[in-house]
Design a protein with these regions (language model features):
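Noncatalytic, basic helical substrate-engagement surface that gates or grips nucleic-acid strands
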Residues: 2-142, 153-157, 161-162
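Short, polar loop motifs at secondary-structure junctions
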Residues: 143-148
Length: 163
């Protein structure tokens, strides 16, 4: 079996953890990546952001061990989510929130280091659900998103370690 990882959630988890470690915690301590130039973001990564990338990789490797799966496929959200066209207020509560500095670097790293999947107009959990529905005995779905539990198959929650 292969492991499908909701890498959007995992990358955000490590990016926000980095921000909290760096300086005080809470959303007020987060430096908005959209407000920084790329050189400044690179400086952050070179100085002490490497532990977040190592932690991200370590988390994926731990999931592979705990689920006894053969390989990880990291799923990310594609561009242009169709839900915004249907419901303009979709995830409106998240608008205006600062974007963690390391998020893009973590995503770039994951796309270079791991097998990844994304599909335009779909979120990561949609990609996972489609893949798992097509081949239910082939995948374990790793996520903390409770909505994904609607998809029949084997599920793994990395926060609780429960399958």
């Amino acid at each position: 079996m292969d492991l499908l990882v909701d890498a959007d959630i995992l990358a955000c988890q490590f990016a926000y953890a980095y921000e909290a470690r760096r300086g005080g915690g809470g959303t007020r301590a987060i430096v908005d990546a959209d407000m920084m130039d790329p050189e400044a973001q690179d400086d952050w990564l070179r100085t002490d952001g490497r532990w977040a990338i190592a932690g991200f990789d370590s988390a994926v490797e731990r999931m592979l061990r705990e689920t006894r799966t053969d390989k990880a496929i990291l799923c990310f959200t594609g561009s242009e989510n169709f839900r915004y066209a249907i419901l303009p207020t979709y995830k409106a509560n998240r608008r205006g929130q600062p974007r963690p500095v390391l998020l893009d670097a973590l995503i770039d790293h994951a796309q270079q280091a791991w097998e990844c999947r994304s599909e335009d107009s779909l979120e990561a959990d949609d990609v996972m659900g489609i893949m798992a529905t097509k081949s239910p005995r082939r995948y374990v779905m790793a996520s903390t998103d409770k909505d994904l539990k609607q998809v029949p198959g084997v599920h793994y929650n990395w926060r609780t370690g429960c399958m």
